From Swiss-Prot:
Pathway terms, separated by semicolons: Cell wall biogenesis; peptidoglycan biosynthesis
First-listed, main subcellular location of the protein, grouped into a coarse class: cytoplasm
Cofactor section: Mg(2+)
Residues with N6-carboxylysine modification: 211
EC number: 6.3.2.13
The species this protein was found in: Rickettsia rickettsii
Transmembrane segments: none
Recorded coiled-coil stretches: none
Protein name: UDP-N-acetylmuramoyl-L-alanyl-D-glutamate--2,6-diaminopimelate ligase
Keywords, comma-separated and alphabetical: ATP-binding, Cell cycle, Cell division, Cell shape, Cell wall biogenesis/degradation, Cytoplasm, Ligase, Magnesium, Nucleotide-binding, Peptidoglycan synthesis
Length: 479
């Protein structure tokens, strides 16, 4: 088939490949693939109307349409076309999985590469970020782990523009659905593990095994896994990887790289650790003990790619916090964080509670997303009641669920603690800011970097950090 595909590309002056009729561009080939929820064959005419020069399908019913070509296996044809059209990748690849911390680690790794004078990029929840050169990528699908075509297209574009190092997030959904196909990485990282996505995986064991596919299916034979030693299931993970002949090293309070002491404040933290029988310490403006682990996972990732350990450590002082990840807004005591799981919310609240002044109060504004894991909602209410002094329950991205019912499920876990329920997220944030007293801390949790709110089918502009800034101008908080 290779010869035929190459001929087709030349004959029709093909400019690109597409599996989504919404993103088809002039001179693209559209591959009509049947997915989990939609069938590309239903959108053939739409793709042609947008400029597709050809459509490839394995559904014989559609070959009566002009410009439609039948093949026995459309997926195989797509993969063959990708190898012809988007063959290049950056020379070194690192993948990061984990319930929480993926976005932070990929950003820290890419930032550090740049600080070491290398051209690097990251792909994940926040999108494509390019360090050391201008931004080259537009129209990125909103998935933590991209579909295989999108990934290869972006990786090829990056390599064509001189990007040497690529680090990306690997979600449990993406791994379970084999979106990465045959992609192999030099380093694979595991940041954290706790309950999430049970609406998809059904059990925590299935969820964990999906994560571990990264190390079994995608790590090069001479590659290394970098694991957070403080994961509750770490012994199972180590045994599982050992049984599959995967080399690994651990980071954490009981790791091969051992975190020995943290001194945290609202301005940042001093991190002390030992590695290879040497003691180290460095300062960072990034807040949170969990971020200490994330930073050091990033350090080992780059070290095992081939960079001198001390050079990597020296660059850490310039690594910046990631948007929406324990992001301190304009030097106030107001933080925006993506914490949307029970574990992430507990860690964020615990960190802020530990660094607040004794007589000050900790407030939290949060909700839960609709059409997602319902089991975590009451747990998050329970955690807020345990860790925060003031609780404000609001809407997150309700999607197609009744937001009032989502809030009720959160509130069911709060039990005896006081709370305030304000459906409108902006009003909830404003209420939280207005009620701050001297030295109080406010955490706005759940949406982090997102610049939208999904209500039904509508995706409305909304940015927690910008709403906080707007409220600060009006409210003049004392924090």
């Amino acid at each position: 088939m290779s010869h035929n595909l190459k001929q087709l590309f030349q004959q029709h002056n093909v400019k690109g490949l597409s599996i989504n009729s919404k993103t088809v561009k002039d001179k693209d080939i559209f591959f009509a693939i049947k997915g989990r929820n939609t069938d590309g064959n239903d959108f053939i005419k739409d793709a042609l109307s947008k400029g597709a020069v050809l459509v490839i399908t394995d559904n014989k019913k559609n070959i009566v349409i002009d410009k439609v070509i039948y093949v026995k296996d459309v997926q195989a044809a797509l993969y063959e076309a990708i190898e012809i059209f988007y063959p290049k990748k950056p020379k070194d690849l690192i993948a990061v999985t984990g319930t929480n911390g993926k976005s932070s680690v990929v950003s820290y790794i890419a930032q550090t590469y740049s600080l070491l004078g290398k051209k690097a990029a990251s792909i994940g929840t926040i999108g494509v970020e390019i360090f050391g050169c201008v931004n080259l990528i537009n129209d990125v699908p909103e998935l933590t782990t991209l579909d295989y075509l999108s990934f290869r297209k972006i990786a090829h574009n990056l390599a064509e523009n001189g990007i040497e190092y690529l680090v990306f997030e690997a979600s449990s959904h993406g791994l379970d659905q084999a979106r990465l196909r045959e992609i192999k990485v030099n380093i694979a990282c595991f940041t954290s593990f706790s309950q999430d996505h049970l609406d998809y995986h059904h059990t925590k064991e299935n969820y964990l095994l999906a994560k571990l596919k990264l190390f079994i299916n995608h790590l090069l034979p001479n590659g290394i896994a970098i694991l957070n030693s403080d994961i509750e299931e770490i012994e199972f993970v180590k045994d599982y990887l050992h049984n599959h002949n995967v080399k690994f090293i651990t980071v954490g309070t009981k790791g091969d790289l051992e975190i020995t002491r943290l001194n945290c404040s609202l301005k940042g933290q001093n991190i002390n650790f030992t590695f290879n029988n040497r003691e180290y310490n460095f300062n960072t403006p990034i807040i949170g003990s969990f971020q200490a682990s994330n930073l050091l996972i990033a350090v080992l990732s780059i070290h095992y790619i081939g960079f001198a350990f001390d050079d990597v450590i020296d660059s850490l002082v310039e690594v910046k916090a990631v948007k929406g990840r324990m992001e301190r807004i304009d030097n106030t005591n107001i933080f925006v964080d993506y914490a949307h799981t029970p574990d992430a919310l507990e860690k964020a609240l615990t960190e802020l509670k530990n660094i607040k002044l004794r007589d000050s109060k900790l407030s939290v504004v949060f909700g839960c997303g609709g059409n997602r894991d319902k089991a975590k909602r009451s747990l998050m209410g329970q955690i807020a009641a345990k860790r925060a002094d003031t609780i404000i329950i609001t809407d997150d991205n309700p999607r197609h669920e009744d937001p009032k019912l989502i809030r009720a499920e959160i509130i069911s876990g709060i039990e005896k603690a006081d709370y305030t329920e304000i459906a409108n997220r902006e009003e909830a944030i404003k209420y939280g800011i207005n009620n701050l007293k001297q030295d109080d801390i406010l955490l706005v949790a759940g949406k982090g970097h997102e610049n939208y709110q999904i209500i039904g089918d509508k995706k409305l502009p909304f940015d927690d950090a910008e709403v906080v800034r707007k409220c600060i101008k009006v409210c003049h908080p004392v924090a």
